[in-house]
């Protein structure tokens, strides 16, 4: 085979697509409390925007409760506002510099909406994996055209790229199925 084609680079990029999908899915609310639920929230602080985890500590004291301990007392209002406006349907209760956030039960309609969103994230992940595959295939065609690899080597490598893509998409489907199970669990 040729040193001109690096399949490990494609593996890294596809693993990146899987990790991105996992990160996106962590932001979806399930029935259980999770500190990662608040990760996407950004706060207007000190003249700029910053992630909530840079102005507060997030803990899970109970299965349906989040606790946000704000480090700077002057930031409590901004953190509370950002959580309310996040679109997650959360209403923090302020207690000094600590915000307690009870997680209400998800109704059936909201669960189905979250499953749809999870499937949209999965489709974005599959598209990203296919883009990586396309880049790999284009590179192989160029190497073949420039006579840097033989047609046989090109065919073998393109089969490896396709197999890698199939495995990546299967892994994404598994990740989404697990998340769907968590969301639909009552």
From Swiss-Prot:
Keyword Hydrolase: no
Stored SUPFAM superfamilies: Ribosome recycling factor, RRF (SSF55194)
Superkingdom of the source species: Bacteria
Keywords for the protein's UniProt record, in alphabetical order: Cytoplasm, Protein biosynthesis
UniProt-recorded Gene Ontology molecular function terms: ribosomal large subunit binding
Family matches, as InterPro entries: Ribosome_recyc_fac (IPR002661), Ribosome_recyc_fac_dom (IPR023584), RRF_sf (IPR036191)
Cell division found in the keyword field: no
Principal location class: cytoplasm
Annotated Gene Ontology cellular component terms: cytosol
Subcellular localization, as worded in the UniProt entry: Cytoplasm
GO terms classed as biological process: cytoplasmic translational termination
Family matches, as Pfam families: RRF
Entry function: Responsible for the release of ribosomes from messenger RNA at the termination of protein biosynthesis. May increase the efficiency of translation by recycling ribosomes from one round of translation to another.
Family, per entry: Belongs to the RRF family.
PANTHER family, sorted: MITOCHONDRIAL RIBOSOME RECYCLING FACTOR PSEUDO 1 (PTHR20982:SF3), RIBOSOME RECYCLING FACTOR (PTHR20982)
Stated name of the protein: Ribosome-recycling factor
Origin species: Brucella anthropi (strain ATCC 49188 / DSM 6882 / CCUG 24695 / JCM 21032 / LMG 3331 / NBRC 15819 / NCTC 12168 / Alc 37)
Lineage of producing organism: Bacteria, Pseudomonadati, Pseudomonadota, Alphaproteobacteria, Hyphomicrobiales
Name of the gene: frr
């Amino acid at each position: 085979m040729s040193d001109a084609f690096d399949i490990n680079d494609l593996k890294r990029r596809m693993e990146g697509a899987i990790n991105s999908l996992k990160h996106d899915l962590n932001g979806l609310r399930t029935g259980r409390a999770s500190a990662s639920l608040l990760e996407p929230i950004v706060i207007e602080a000190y003249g700029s925007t910053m992630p909530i985890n840079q102005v507060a500590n997030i803990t899970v004291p109970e299965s349906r409760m989040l606790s946000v301990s704000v480090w700077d007392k002057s930031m409590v209002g901004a953190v509370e506002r950002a959580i309310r406006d996040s679109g997650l349907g959360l209403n923090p209760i302020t207690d000094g510099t600590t915000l307690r956030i009870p997680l209400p039960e998800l109704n059936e309609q909201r669960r189905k909406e979250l499953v749809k969103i999870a499937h949209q994230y999965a489709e974005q992940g599959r598209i990203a994996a296919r883009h990586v595959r396309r880049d790999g295939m284009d590179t192989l065609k160029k190497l073949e055209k420039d006579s840097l690899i033989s047609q046989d080597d090109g065919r073998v490598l393109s089969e490896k790229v396709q197999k890698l893509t199939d495995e990546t998409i299967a892994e994404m489907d598994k990740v989404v199925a697990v998340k769907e199970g968590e969301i639909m669990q009552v």
